[in-house]
A protein has these predicted regions:
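Acidic, low-complexity, intrinsically disordered interaction modules
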Residues: 17-60
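Mixed-charge, Lys/Arg-rich low-complexity intrinsically disordered regions
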Residues: 1-12
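Short intrinsically disordered terminal tails
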Residues: 1-2, 59-63
Length: 63
């Protein structure tokens, strides 16, 4: 699995990403809710378009 940094505006709606040590689900062009940690699941926040996020790319074994 490879990770890369991307601006929030480039994360597709419906995609998961990481920011600030939490795992998030992008709900709209400006909002996302926490998936992990579980005790904060469902709490949502506004993000700036240029806020940095980490995305993970699944790679096939041997590539």
């Amino acid at each position: 699995m490879r990770k890369y940094q991307i601006d929030f505006q480039r994360v597709p709606v419906g995609q998961t990403f990481c920011s600030g040590g939490n795992e998030w689900f992008k709900r709209s062009t400006r909002t996302a809710h926490i998936i992990n940690p579980v005790e904060y699941r469902g709490v949502w926040f506004y993000f700036g378009n240029l806020d940095k996020c980490t995305m993970y790319l699944q790679t096939k074994k041997g590539i």
